[in-house]
Amino acid sequence: LLSRGLGDVYKRQGQTLRHDHAFPKGANANLYDVLSQDHLVIRTFERGVEDFTYACGTGTGSLVALLTALGQTSGHGVRVENLGGQLIVDAEQTDGQISALLLTGPATLVCQGHVPDEALPEESTK
């Protein structure tokens, strides 16, 4: 679906899910399409960014874990297309449960920052 020009529809869905009353503080929304058993497309609408981001390892790993547990992917070498590129995900299972995830793909440093302790709320530094 994402590859068929439905980006605006997905963005509206992402906004709706991100602000759903079930999540009082908001939530990230992961929208996906299955291209084949082990080839997925995912878009993550992130809280705070209020738009799609290039990639989300947590969302990507969660998607593969869920689809593997449901038997919809093999869990081995699953290709997941993010806006920022492709990740390969392996979901290890132990006794029928996902026990580990391995995400492999490129990583690029896009910014760097420093927050001094004085800028943090007092309870954060204890």
Segments (PLM) and residue ranges:
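Gly/Ser/Thr-rich beta-alpha loop segments that engage phosphate groups in nucleotides
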Residues: 7, 59-61, 107
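Residue-level signal for inorganic ion chemistry
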Residues: 32, 57, 103
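Conserved glycine-rich phosphate/nucleotide-binding loop
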Residues: 65-126
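Conserved phosphate-donor
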Residues: 14-45, 50, 86-90
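Glycine/serine-rich anion-binding loops at beta->alpha junctions
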Residues: 45-68
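Single conserved hydrophobic/aromatic residue that forms the stacking wall/gate
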Residues: 1-10
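Short glycine- and Lys/Arg-enriched binding-loop motifs that mark or flank ligand-binding interfaces
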Residues: 1, 22, 51-55, 80-81, ...
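Conserved strand-loop elements at the edges of beta-sheets that form or border functional pockets
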Residues: 3, 34, 82
